[in-house]
């Protein structure tokens, strides 16, 4: 079984804001050091950014308002310098920014199918949504906000879902219509890694960090290689190291970072990566 959330889930909104700030940092310099945490809910967005790259607070606020679709949200933004020891460690060449353990695995047919369904629903209804698929029992659970409760003009959405997904045993909005979003639920960075990474394992979060952070670069690299090889790969690294051990064999961290950079650029940046994670429509 697998659970997927869409880009309007509050946790994904937090991830997307964090990703947008990383994108802003990369516009300022080629190799920024960034670690962003976001907590959002009930008309307030708190952000702490540990970084060596000064961002214009107006750009930060604009990104928050754009992603939340809320021009009145209160933004509490705090930017602090990265720890000097961590910053100095990266001065000569890119090295692992922290200790980490990782496992990349091939995406399963179940994960691909649910992600396809979630993406198609989101194209039709771009509001907060969460979905579960269990192919063993052919069961599909859809919790989609703002689509009616059976007594409104919006019930055509239900009809469309039932027509479109006839081969699944479906439950749609089991307690009726709901409105979702950050006024109903709070969101925080890196709380939906199961949705983002499937059966993969990571010691840290995927979002809100620059590519020197192994939590970003190694997770992306192992995901790509697992798809290529059709099998799982395990890795570990330690802070300050220029190698990552993948299935016991040392690999150059700089090359891993460049492969991850190409992946992020191809997908459209860190904010785009945060929309669906590594398993995307």
Where are these regions (language model features)?
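A domain-level signal for the structural core that forms small-molecule/cofactor-binding pockets
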Residues: 1-281
